[in-house]
Structures are given as structure tokens and as C-alpha cells.
Amino acid sequence: MKKELTDLFKNSEVSEAQNFNSIKITLASPEKIKSWTYGEIKKPETINYRTFRPEKDGLFCARIFGPIKDYECLCGKYKRMKFRGIICEKCGVEVTKSNVRRERMGHINLATPVAHIWFLKSLPSRISLAVDMKLKEVERVLYFENFIVIEPGLTGLQKNQLLNEEELAKYQDEFGEESFEAGIGAEAILSILKSMDLELERKLLINTIKETKSKVNEERSIKRLKLIESFIETGQKPEWMILTVIPVIPPELRPLVPLDGGRFATSDLNDLYRRVINRNNRLKRLMDLKAPDIIVRNEKRMLQESVDALFDNGRRGRVITGTGKRPLKSLAEMLKGKQGRFRQNLLGKRVDYSGRSVIVVGPDLKLHECGLPKKMALELFKPFLYARLNKLGLASTIKQAKKLVEKETNAVWDALELIVREHPVLLNRAPTLHRLGVQAFEPKLIEGDAIELHPLCCAAFNADFDGDQMAVHVPLSLEAQLEARILMLSTNNILSPSNGKPIIVPSQDMILGLYYLSQAPFQTEKPDGYFINNDEIEHALSTGQIKVHSTIVSRFETLDEKGNKRVEKHTTTAGRFLLANLLPKHKDITFSMIDRLLPKKTVSEIIDSVFRFCGQKTTVIFCDHLKDLGFKHAFKAGISFGKDDLVIPANKGQLIEDTKKLIADYENQYSEGLITRGEKYNKVVDAWSKCTDKVAGEMMRGISATESTPDGMKINSVFMMADSGARGSAAQMKQLAGMRGLIAKPSGEIIETPIISNFKEGLTALEYFNSTHGARKGLADTALKTASSGYLTRRLCDVAQDLTISKIKCDNPGFIELAEILEGGNVVVSLSERALGRVTAFDVKNPITGEVVIKKETMIDEAGCDKIDAAGVKFIKAYSVMTCSSKLGVCATCYGRDLSRGKMVHVGEAIGMISAQSIGEPGTQLTMRTFHVGGTASVKQESQIVTKTAGTLKIINSNLLEDSKKNLIVMGRNTQLSIEDNNGVQVAVYKVAYGSKLFFQNGDKVKANEKICEWDPYTTPVIAEKSGIAGYVDLIDGVSIQETTDDATGISSKSVIDWRAQSKNTDLKPRITLRDDKGNVIKKADDNEARYYLVPDSILSVKDGQKIFAGDIIARLPKETTKTKDITGGLPRVAELFEARKAKDSAIIAENDGQVLFGKEVRGKQRISIQPDNGEPSNYLIPKGKHINFNQGEKIKKGEYLLDGQPLPHDILRILGIKDLTEYFVNQVQEVYRLQGVIINDKHIETILRQMLKKVEIKESGDSSYLPGEMIDRIKFDNTNEKLVAEGKNPASGERVLMGITKASLQTESFISAASFQETTRVLTDAAIKGKVDPLNGLKENVIVGRLVPAGTGHIKNKWNKNAIDADNKFLAEQEKIEPLETTETPAN
């Protein structure tokens, strides 16, 4: 009776299994495997081909795995529930549910041990490390090629020595068969592993590491030590890597499916298992028959191979194929890749209650609604409908309800209306690139088959109506409906999570209508009418008394400071009064907001202001009104365009002629040898790109002018479309009516001859041919980039998925310094923009008066930003995700504002995912949109600095020289010019290139728009610092210097060639020295000799023996020709930054202050050392031919670039620290996105960077168990050190390491998350050996094990659970104190 009762509560076991908070993975011992299984499989048969019943003891045996039909044994003796749990004495099958066939396992007892291929072949090979042999040697033993000495005895053989058959026979003859023990195959390896004394090995290895001098030995010993220690710590035995029992997975997971025509489709695993069983049985038979050794050995090898194929087919040897040469899918393949178990079934599941259809626009919907076709709703809400019909008494059973619904009577539709009301549904458009790709709407039943979507939601879904489809999902439970309504309803997602700007913004027709309405083409002196309110205006418009653009006087109602009603009188156009009528009443919302032209950007700003001042509800209503007004007036205006609206500028021909003359001039200079071919190319490209811009400018000027016509003013339609931001851009119009300009070859180089025609004039055949390049490149790029952008997003999501907001404030947060970002002297991002939404770490003070503008610990909002701008603050110290000291996740104070809500972030928000999506989403957008500008090249070379504002010029790090013409030449490598206003506040900073000409002295007053300095953008000069006679040294004709005569011009110039091509010349150092009249080398100001080393490709500007003056150019090094800038450069650049890859030509950063000294050459590289005033010099090897920024003996500061290029982020972290790294990294990523006009908040990039800095590399192990060079999680490292310090021991020391996102994802604490990302086999083998425990902290691992994610609702639930457990433990502890324990036994923990 008791048994049956327990059977009734069978499910209680399941809940036990679900209540866990971490998962551990270890090796399975043979005993463990046997404990899982329900019996041994002895036969390879599957099912009987006549009866279709499973064979006894076969792969589908019902006795082992359970019955085929619910509660029915195989022979049919026991049927029905009442015999539950009985085992039939005839067929041996337990009477139970048939779904146990999905969970019961079997096993195969192997006749001989077999090595597990993952631990053998997955690098580093764990088996070969454990036995301390090479992988090749272990393989030769396992696959029966060589014998191995297991126990040498007194023979003088080495332990683990390999012997072939002849050697074995020879030694056995020599020493006798019993004197030593040798073996072959997995048995031999098994006995070696069994005989290992782990503790002894550990001691020996520690000694070896201390004593060894060889780096290789040390590394291998450390690897072995780690392996041995993980065995000791986890209590696993190394011999478990060799299998003696193989588990067989449940039959329902590898089914046999009958097909039509009596054939069967089978899972590949069945084939693989059959192979193993066949060979195993044959081996048993051969051993019983005492067959010759050679036959048995061959059979053992075949068994090993078949087990290998079962676990990981194709990992070793040839792939085992099934029918039609198709490789069989092994167990490993079931797990890995996009189609594997992790990504296909655990992270992405199919859902019910969903449908999909084409979308059409629903202009009359409210923002929170979507149109749902009746048919779809009927199908989706069927269960609810049955329940409702039942409740209404229209149907008493489900069957009746079903019939009723099939008839589709009116009662059914009425009931459906009631159910659907206020039951939100989720709409999703693929690809879902960010969280706004899934939003909740209230369905509104419509006729037809298409889903209606609100036009303002298109931007969030990136949807258009050219055939896009969307999926509908129904949230079923009350909790799901609640979350959908509160968190996901489209009206709750007005702001974009990536930048905090509104994403619900009118576009296209709506913008065009609003723009047209806000036009004021002619302001008349005398108004056309006086009106009291909007009703009167609308009446006058409808009767035709006034037009939309007539100037009128009317009243505008608003609120004053105290919130009382205030009426203002304004004079403007009727259209603007219509717009003003939509504005909500609020003291901060003024008439001037709307009394201007309204292109898209301005409309976005207005919506933003309304949201900040009036809240969400008002904004939603306002947006809906804007939409209606926009559509209405776009339709009323009737804007369209014909070909005459594309006006080609009259002076286009003249501009092109001028440019052609300029280019002829360059050709002459080139033919006279004044400039090289590369320089000519650069100048020509420059000239044409300037010409194109001029033509485009003229065209825009022509189009933007309004013309008077008898019936009012005519505004150019095309201009309106582009200027308003409704459709098209200046770049596209330039191609339609200006000139197409320069285009790039597929390689990225720019073709010198531009396309002079535009599309309206039509292209010539040659121009058309040239432009086909751009068109095709665009399409090819799009296809390729979409994939790579999606992959970038996936990697970002994977690295950041476990980062959430864990508490309000951490204990001792650090801070970062924010300043405005300058590019070429222009402020690109103001300080207030960067500071918005951050929490201040110190008081922000006015730099002039010193008064506190914003107190510390305050979140900077829009009002705070205005204060910062007004006070002219230059720096702010604010908290950042990068410097947060929380152990798990990040605290809300360091994160700041939740951009999508405009308020402080909530605890439990999944900020990692939001950041990953914010960075990944525009990547895809941009890549999908590369081809819009048709490969037209846009080139802008900076060659001068023109001031933006007036002020006083200050030269920072001044190092100047006057040349013979009295020009000031900049000789400093990091000279900067700054402009200061009258208060001495810096208003602009410019970096100046070496060799620039300065037109002003330090302290001079400069006006706005004055040229203060210029340089040649195409070459880097080498400049003489003293006057003297130039002398060539090691510049030998034909070896290190050659005279090139240009074919076209016949002019010759001398350039340095690579002299190292021949080995005999490697010690040459081509240079130019300056000597005085007596032939002595002149000393420079810093007491070094005036020598100038030259690199290959330098063009000499002086002759041997020529007299030169200080400031003259000795040689020029041409810079690379310009390539087009496109996100194509951008996306790989972003990926390169996040992967922390080494760039091809990376910069070299000085590690300390000191003097630059040139040393001897080492293997064709120039050795340079920096000698500090005291201490060891730091040495660098620089490939020859690279241009070094410093000359012999010059002083260099820490962090300066010795060699130009992209610096390595690792170097910045090591030399300058985390704050500098953050600044550099954020700016580099932002530069790429800024170029595309995409705004992303800095904190998203910082969030990812935080995840890349999770690990610490151990330098000194102190008293910890860490080994030098080991990578340890930062939190673990800190915890260990805290413990050690508390115990009075030496803590370990280490330094932060920057890891690429892929590597960081694979190195997370969670092996489940890492395994589902990439390299599944490697991650799992590694985790099993280490006995890793997954604490289930991230989102991904929780999705995989099927629990609530620990963010949002899940975070709160976890918190409650923890509080409950703590309370229980406290209560139990108190109870124990009260009740004295009667037993004397110690309780087991």
C-alpha cells in the first residue's frame, strides 16, 4: 500500500529536482553510470521487423526502458492504471506511463576499457597531461601501435617507455617475461592512471616548478599541476577518463520513425550504438574463444574507434558515414552549433499561441493599439473563447463550444470582442535587434488578413510596409499580461534605450505635413486676420478666407510659473497656430517651441521636451495628435515632384572648368618634377571633391530659394522632402541635380576622374561603367555586413548577459573624468551631453566663481546640463560602471539614469543586455544601409587650422623654429594650440602636426575664422634644426637610394629604397648629416649630433653637399593615399576594438619618461631604448622602415607615441591605467558611430568594457593556491586576498587583463553559458575535469535550465527567496539554542 501511495505523489520528486541554486558538472565514474541505468543492452537489434515490437535486450528494449503504451506491459497481460508499478513476470516490463522511455537510460558493459575521445583529443589533451606523455605517444598506445612499460622493475627500462613488438620480444627474452610489466591499449593507460599517487605527484611538481630554469618545462609543469590539483580538489579519479561502461540515452531521444512503404527513418545515434554493441559482442566472443592476440587487438582497436565515433564522429581518423556518404551525427554534434541542443532547443524554443501575417499601416490606431485580423484572433484566443462561451451559458461542453466557434455566429464575435479587450498581445518583427523589436499592443479586431501597425512604431521595429511580416504572441498567465502591459506596452517605450532620445517620432509623410504646415514663406507687414481661438482659424481656413501660410494674429493659452492660466497674443502663420493648439499646457512649454520651421530633428526635440515636462501620458496623446495633423496636411498640401523640380545650378560648368584648369596646373607641376605621382593624385582628388561640394552647395542654394507666383509662394518640393528629413538627403540630391563626384574602386581607392554628370542629365557610357562599381559594392557589402554585424551582436550579448543592477550603491566607487570631445578643434560632443544621466562623484563648481553648481551624489538631469553649460564647466568627476566596486553586477549609483525611462535605473535591470543591443543594433542598421550613397567618395583632408572663435593664442608644449623666410615652424611632436577667452577659459584646443607653419606667436590675439597654421596633409617632412652643409651617409646609388625618372615627365627624383633586400647591406644606416664649413658634424640644441635617419620611400629634397638653412625640409615621406570612409571600415573596427585585437601597424607607447636612444639593430629591427633619469631602460624593437617620431637623444614622456598608429588597448591599460583606457576605448568606438550619425550613450560601451576587464593575471602567488600566469576572476581574486589578509598571510598580486569579448565569454564563471556560446566540447571537458559549479547568476544559464531570469521580476523573486531562507536559518539557529540537543552525536552538515 505504502508503495502505491508514494506512486501517487510521483511528481513530488520533480519539484525536489527543480529546487536548486547551482549546477555542478563532473566526470562520471563507472559506478555512477550504472546507478543511472535500468539494465544492460546486450544486442544490437532495435525492433522486430514483423511485429514492430522492441527486441528484448536490444536498443529499444521495453524491459529496460519502459512500456510502449501507457500502463500496458509488452505481452498485454497487465493493462490499465490499477496494475501501476507491477512488473510483469512474463515479459519483465514495468506497468507505468510510456513517457519514461524519454528518461530511462541503459548501459553497455565494455569488454575492454576505452579512452574517452574528448579527454584525449580536446586540446590540451587531459589524458596525456595526466600520464605526462606526448599526445602522439598516448595515441600510439591507445590505437595498438606500441606497447608501453607500466612497471619497469629492475630492468633499467624507463617507466612509460614505448616499445614496438620486436623490442618487447627482445626485452622479454633478455630480462624474462615476469621481470617487467608492459601493456597496450586503453587497459595499459588505465592501469597507469590507477597507479598514480596524486598527492605525491603534486609535491614533485611544485618542486620541479621551483627548481626548473627552462620556461617550457615550467609551463608544462604548471599545466600538469593545475590538472592534478583539480582531481584532488574535486575528489575525481583520473582513471574515470577511461570508460569501462557506456551509458545509452533513452530510446525516445533517438527514435525510429516508420515511413510510408514499410521503411524506417532512424536517428544516427542508433547506427553508432549498434556499431559499438556489435564490436563489443564480437570482442567478447573472441576472448572467450581465446583467439590469437593480433585478432583480439584489432577488435579492441575497432571498438575504441566505434566509441570515438559515437561520442565525436570525425574528431579522429576518418568520419563514419551512413547512407549516401553523409557523416553520422554523433553525441557531440547534437550539442554544438546553431542546430545543436543548446542554441536550437534550450535558448530558442518554439511557442504556441502565435501567428504571423503581413503588416499594413494603421493611421487611425491609437499608439497603444494594433489591428488584429478577426480570423487570427479567433484562432489565437480559442481556449479563452471556449471558457467565455461556457461561462455565458452558450455552450455547456468544450465540444459544443468548438462547434459554435466553427459556425462563427454573432455571439462568438461578441464574446471574442470581450476577451480581446484589454488583453495585450506581443508583436515582434524579425530581426529583433533590440528590445523594442518586441512590443505589446491592445488588439483591435479588424476585417482582412493583415496586421495593422501604428505608423509611429515603425522606427522601433525598423518596419516598413513593402511586404514586411510580423508575428503575434499571446501572453497567457496573469503575470505575463501584467508584465506586457506595464513594461512592454508601446506607450511605455517612448524613449530609445540606447540614447534616451524619443524613438516614437513622426517620419516621412507626417514630417512632410508638419514641415509644410510650419512654413512661413512670406511674412506680410499687415496680418491677414485677427482670430480669438483655433475654432475661428479652422473655420476661416475651411471657407478659404485665409491660407495655411497666411500671417494672422491669435491667442495662445498656457500656464504661468504658479500654474495659473495665461493668455498670450502672437503673430505668425495660421499653420503654426494649428500646431500650437496641440501643445500641452505647461509653464515650460512655450509658443516659441513651435513658432519655427519643423524638420524631423526639431519635432523630436519638441516630443522630448513634452515628455520631460508633462510626463508619458500627455506625450502619447500629443504624438497621436501630431500624427493625425501630419497625415492630414501632407494629403492636403499635395506635395509631389517632377523633373523640373531638380534644378541644376547655372554655374556648374564654370566650376568644373576652374577645377580642370587647377588639375592641368597639377599635371604641369608633376611633369616638372615638383611633386610626385602620389602627391599629384592626392591633390587632384582633393580638388575634385572641393568642386563637387561647391556644385552641391550651389544646387542647394538654388533649390532652397522660394519663388513668387501669382497665387502665393512656390517652395521646391524636393527641397522640402530633403530638408524636412522626410525622405532623401542632400547627398542623394547632389547626385540627382549636382554632380555625382568622385567614386571609389571596389578596393577602396578613389578613381581620379570624377563623374561630372548627374542623374538628371544622364551619365556618359564611361561614367556609367565607372559607377557600376559603387552600385555592386553596395549590395555585396550589405549581404556580408549583415551577417558580421549579427555575429558582433551575439558576442556582445554573450559577454554582457550576466550584468544586472544588483544594489542601490556600492561601498567605495571610483570615478572617471568627463570633458568635452574635440575633433579638429570643433566640439563634437559637449560636456553636458556626456554628463547627462550620470551621478556626480564630487561637487561641480563654477570654474570662475568657485560656487557649487551641482552637489555631489546628484544625478545630472536636463536642468543640470543647462547649469553646466551656463557656468562654463570644463571637467566633471562622475561615477561610472567602469569604477563600480560591486562584486556581482553593478550598482544603480554608478550606472545612473535608465535611458529608456528618463529616471534613475531600477535594481534588477539587465543593463548588460541593453548595452549589447544598443551597440549591436545600429551596426546592423548601418550595414543594411551602406549602399544608399552609391560608393560616391567623400574626401576631406585637413591641411590647416582656422579659428572658430576669437581669443588669445596659447602654445602648449612649444617647440618652434624660424626658417630662412622668417616662418615659424613647429618642431614639437605634441605641440597644441589653445584659444582662451578673456577670462582665461579654454574655448578650443588644436593638435598641430610636426612641420606645420604657424602664422601667430604665443599670446597673440586672433579673430574668428583666421588661419593660424597650415601643413602639407600628404607628406611627413624631415626638417633641419640647424643650418649647415648636407652630407649623404650610407646613401649608395642602387643600394639604398635610387634615382627614379618619371616616364611621363622625364624628371628625376631621388628616393630611399629598401636596402635590406640584400643581406650584405643590412648594417647600412642611410642618413643625412649636417656639417659646418670645416666638415665637423653640427651639434643640435640638445647636444646630440644633427643626423637624420631615413626610411624607405622617403623622397630626398636636398643634394649631397648642398648648403641648407634651419627649417628647410631635408626629405619628405609620402602618406598613404586617401581611402573612402564607410562603416565598412567601421564595423570591422568596432569588432577589432571589442575583440581587443592587435592592429597590423600598432603604435608604440613610451612606458616611462626618459631619453630616446637608438641601439644596435637586432635581426633587421631597429632597437630603441628609453633611458629614464634613474632606473632600468625600457627597450623596443621597431621594424625597419617605420617612421620613428623622435630623434636620437630627444626627451619623451610616459604615454607619448614613439611610433604612430593605433595604440593597443592592452598597452594603455598597462601604462596609463583604467581611466585612460576607458576614455580611449569609448572615444574610439564612438568615433565610428559618430561618423554614421548614430548616437549611443557612453555607458553602454563602458558596460561592455567592464565585462572585458573581469580577469586578473596572477603575477606573484603569495600564500594563495594560485599559480603565476593564471587568469582568475576579479571577484574571486579579491575575496581570496581579503581572506589571506585577515589570516595574516601574504596576499597574491596580479594585474587587470583586457580580454576580447569572445575570450571573455568563454572564460565566464558559468560553463553553461560558455558552452552554449562557442567551442562546446572544449568548454565542457574543461569544466568536467575542474568539477566546475555554475552559480546560475546570468540570464542565459537560467533560460537554459528553465528558470526565471535573475533580472526584473526574477531578481525580486530571488531576493525574496534569499530573505526567506535567511529567516528560516535564523529561526532554526534560535530553536537549537533553546532546545538542548539530547543526542550526543554531532549533526552531519
Curated annotation (Swiss-Prot):
Manner of cofactor binding, per the entry note: Binds 1 Mg(2+) ion per subunit.
EC code: 2.7.7.6
Cellular component terms (Gene Ontology): DNA-directed RNA polymerase complex
Stretches that traverse the bilayer: none
Residues that hold Zn(2+) 2 according to the record: 810, 884, 891, 894
Domain of life: Bacteria
Quaternary structure and interacting proteins, as annotated: The RNAP catalytic core consists of 2 alpha, 1 beta, 1 beta' and 1 omega subunit. When a sigma factor is associated with the core the holoenzyme is formed, which can initiate transcription.
Cofactor(s) listed in the protein's UniProt record: Mg(2+); Zn(2+)
Gene name, Swiss-Prot/TrEMBL: rpoC
Protein name as it appears in the record: DNA-directed RNA polymerase subunit beta'
SUPFAM superfamilies the record matches: beta and beta-prime subunits of DNA dependent RNA-polymerase (SSF64484)
GO molecular function annotations of the record: DNA binding; DNA-directed RNA polymerase activity; magnesium ion binding; zinc ion binding
Pfam families in UniProt: RNA_pol_Rpb1_1, RNA_pol_Rpb1_2, RNA_pol_Rpb1_3, RNA_pol_Rpb1_4, RNA_pol_Rpb1_5
